[in-house]
Amino acid sequence: TNTATTPTATIAPDSIAEIEAAVQQARLDLEDAYFAAASDPGNQQLRQEFRTFYSPEAFGPLEDFLDDLLADGTTLRMSSDVPKSITFPGDFEFLGPKEARLRICRVDSDVVRIPPTNGRAEVIVDDRVVATLTDVLLALVEEKWIVTGGDRIMQWQERDSCDF
């Protein structure tokens, strides 16, 4: 006897592909908003734009990070040696009409620094390259995919990929 239930509605594979592409683009747009806010952590407009990519609960630690940058007088800049990247190495999982899970590999090569001022040279605080493999949970809220949570799977210091 077959006890599996038949879904009342199905989603066409090309619709799932479109949703996956929209979720991936949202994550890439989020990265741009992150870098803009972290490059100028005192700019409330940039911070607010970054905040729109997260649920309030998920944004808390990022707010703390931006506050720490501001308190320390530090900002981010791009590395001239290793490019930052985001790739999608795993399966996309459509969890429901407005929920998805996306596996990402983020290579963080951003440089935390004290910017040059008054003729003083830039001071590098942290220029480590870190690759992180994460499952990110997203929800469609008011026509925008936002991050609601996630789980770090692995993290590697001084690596520029999530290949293991």
Give residue spans per PLM region.
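Secondary-structure transition/hinge residues
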Residues: 35-39, 110, 140
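Core segments of small alpha/beta cavity-forming domains
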Residues: 7-81
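Surface-exposed, charged secondary-structure patches
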Residues: 70-121
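Residues that cap or initiate secondary-structure elements
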Residues: 58, 108-110, 142-144
